[in-house]
Amino acid sequence: MSESVHTNTSLWSKGMKAVIVAQFLSAFGDNALLFATLALLKAQFYPEWSQPILQMVFVGAYILFAPFVGQVADSFAKGRVMMFANGLKLLGAASICFGINPFLGYTLVGVGAAAYSPAKYGILGELTTGSKLVKANGLMEASTIAAILLGSVAGGVLADWHVLVALAACALAYGGAVVANIYIPKLAAARPGQSWNLINMTRSFLNACTSLWRNGETRFSLVGTSLFWGAGVTLRFLLVLWVPVALGITDNATPTYLNAMVAIGIVVGAGAAAKLVTLETVSRCMPAGILIGVVVLIFSLQHELLPAYALLMLIGVLGGFFVVPLNALLQERGKKSVGAGNAIAVQNLGENSAMLLMLGIYSLAVMVGIPVVPIGIGFGTLFALAITALWIWQRRH
């Protein structure tokens, strides 16, 4: 089936519904699998510092394949690329279920995720246009965060019951995403007929990086989203160690409940951003970014569950308001310069490089014995300072 690009720009067209459902199921699997695999590592007595290593092999796949996945997304119908990528995720989750080394299985899921991301965001610009793109991003983020909310909780709760059941549920979610991808209209490839010479692809990707970096707006977006997602992933792992130390709770479910509060907040923040921020007023999101770091610092000092829930929800609201406009800005400007697929691939490189760096520093801090509360305080302080510096730089340029 095919249809011309931009024929139906409704936020609830058939194609958009299929994208949102597929994204929900795929993201549900991603987040449930993380906590199910963390429970598996705990059950098999892996050291605590190995937990962030699990995410590092995942983002390492993003970085390794960054020069190629953008071109893949732009050279084929994006819905079919998403289906293939979810198939890889399904294979990775199934391999962990059948006893293959969890780091190897999770790496395969990372490869699928790397291929999936440019297609899932790039297709938004093909299904809707102009002012509706921010709203479409809001829908995508809301779907993603709802999946984070339910997937994280499901992964932790099912893992407390039986780790294998949790892992099987992840594989089932990926299978559902593959089916949903079938219903995405087969849109024309954005940039067909490109060279598949790996050297040329790498050179083309580096040219896309250079082009986006030289543009002040896209550079601003790249740095902002990279800082946010690097910090967000690190916070998830910090919670796993913070909960038993600060709250005295040792189950698998409580960290997932706390992560779910962040997810709920991001849904609210994403909705607010869609209503209050346009591509011309993106700088309105910057104070929210600074406050994220401040609230993380305050959160790290808590010892009661209810204040922890409230502060994490606030972090989520601020995060959703901060990141959605930056995503939309990059997609709109990137689509016109290097193609949406390449723009998102460059964004993934930045975000996952930031994740790798922050997780590496966090893992090292845990390995050398720094207590988790001082880690959280330092983490929040540095994030607030980094976003402040970015805002000052953006206003000057």
UniProtKB/Swiss-Prot annotation:
Renumbered to this chain, the signal peptide range is none
* UniProt keywords, alphabetically: Cell inner membrane, Cell membrane, Lipid transport, Membrane, Transmembrane, Transmembrane helix, Transport
Kindly list the GO molecular function terms attached to this UniProt entry: lysophospholipid:sodium symporter activity
Taken from the UniProt record, the cysteine pairs bridged by disulfide bonds within this chain are none
- Membrane topology type, per the record? Multi-pass membrane protein
Principal place where this protein is found? membrane
Cellular location(s): Cell inner membrane
Q: Which InterPro entries match?
A: LysoPLipid__transptr_LplT, MFS, MFS_trans_sf
Q: Residues on the Cytoplasmic side? A: 39-52, 112-144, 188-226, 278-280, 326-343, 388-397
PANTHER family linked: MACROLIDE-EFFLUX PROTEIN (PTHR43266), MAJOR FACILITATOR SUPERFAMILY (MFS) PROFILE DOMAIN-CONTAINING PROTEIN (PTHR43266:SF2)
Q: Which NCBIfam families match?
A: PRK11195.1
Q: What's this protein's name?
A: Lysophospholipid transporter LplT
Write the lineage as a comma-separated list. Bacteria, Pseudomonadati, Pseudomonadota, Gammaproteobacteria, Enterobacterales
User: Which gene does this sequence derive from?
Assistant: lplT
